[in-house]
Amino acid sequence: MGTVYGPNRINGRSRVEAIYEAIVGRIDRGLMRPGERLPSIRAAAQTFGVSKNTTVEAYDRLVAAGRVESRPGSGFYVSQHRPKRGEPPSPASIEAVDIIWLLREQLEKRYEVRIGDGRPPAAWMEGPEMARALRPVARPGQRILPESYGPPAGLPALRERIALTLAERSINVTPAQVLLTHGANDALDMIVRHFVEPGETVLVDNPGYYPLFGKLHLAKAELAGVRRNPDGPDLDELAQRAAATGARLFFTQSLAQNPTGCSITLPVAYRLMQIADTHNLRIVDTDPFADVLPATSPRPAALDQLDRVIYVGTFAKTLSASLRCGYIAADPDTVSALADVKMITRTNSSGYIEQIVYDLITSGRYRNHLKRLIDRIEVATRTAHDSLSRLRLPVFGQPAGGFYMWCVLPSGIDDKELSRTAAEHGILLAPGAAFNPEATAGPPAMRVNIAYANDDRFARFMRTIGATF
């Protein structure tokens, strides 16, 4: 095993960068060979004279860069496949990579116990309706695959159906105000590309949706967090930050928010729109769980009728993550501008997937699927509350309707270090730090997926390390 030696003092660089560069330098000089195990987090922290948390961030960056492999339960090893040399990553790219490490772990699915996963179990999305939809049979005279790209805004029939659905939520739009996308993340990417300028300050939920933070960092934006309360954004902080920064955009998730699971109340939604008017803010509101929530839930878009609100919806959370289909609803000028962005960056969305989604909706199969999904969410929410109560882990607010709960941890716990330790035991946690848009550390917490909260292995782990109250 090689030993990593590093500086005790670091000039002109962050400690994370210094550790990263020291290890990469030893790998490049052949002093650490492919397959060789890196020192443990504790040993490396002592060698460099830094905290374990700093070492974890440096190791995460090495993994993201492909220089090091993480093997749960074993440690970190020099990658067997050395990446091709090229231009060094920009600081914006490095920040985005640091933010999306949790997404990478969710996609690779290396952990058996998935407390921090963003998705429900696959069984929740399976059933006869889904099976039939994914094996479409063409009717006489009907093509299985579209013969051309299709209109830039997406399948007209699905856009019409979405407009009807939005009307049920008291959001009155024409089909021309609906732009189809490859899911909510794709929609957010287009919005960021169009609206956000380098160096601009953007307001976001804190805690909030970490993939969005990555997109904003890539756009070289400055992020200013707005504290999330159980009943919605902290309105005093929103007004103060809007006035202080001159921000033009506030990205939020009003209902079943990720990661807290809590929803905005009607009085807060009204006041939110008043603040938006006062400070000339556009509100980008993502509503991924809309189809399993009451149509009468308070939505800023219904109060505003898409004057200041850009409304983002998706079928990926409630249908299948593999069927990447979502939409943007906004005023006509905004939709037209975003359609241009879509054509330049994507050409168009998938007419084939859009046709599948449309058929599911109009045949009634999607409605039947949603009924089962709502039942599963309700049962899992009750079970998760019971399980976390037995562990004496307080749940933030009254989460309902989505997949998540936000658990407060004892003040002495480092949630990132807890996540690292859990990974060594084959447990995926989602530490609160991943959902913090700012460099300052917030109170220790973690996001819990309600579908997995009742796992005995998670309970034993939390009790063993004393991470409960």
Predicted features by range, described:
Residues 310-390, 396-397:
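PLP-dependent aminotransferase class I/II
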Residues 204, 225, 283-285, 357, ...:
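Hydrophobic residues in well-ordered beta-strands that form the structural core
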Residues 1-138, 339, 343-350, 359, ...:
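N-terminal basic, amphipathic alpha-helical segments
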Residues 139, 143-279, 291-306, 377:
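Conserved core of the PLP fold type I
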Residues 201, 222, 282, 394, ...:
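Residue-level detector of anion-binding/catalytic polar loops
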Residues 69-70, 395-400:
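Short beta-strand
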Residues 70, 173, 429-430:
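Short beta-strand "wing" residues that participate in macromolecule-binding interfaces
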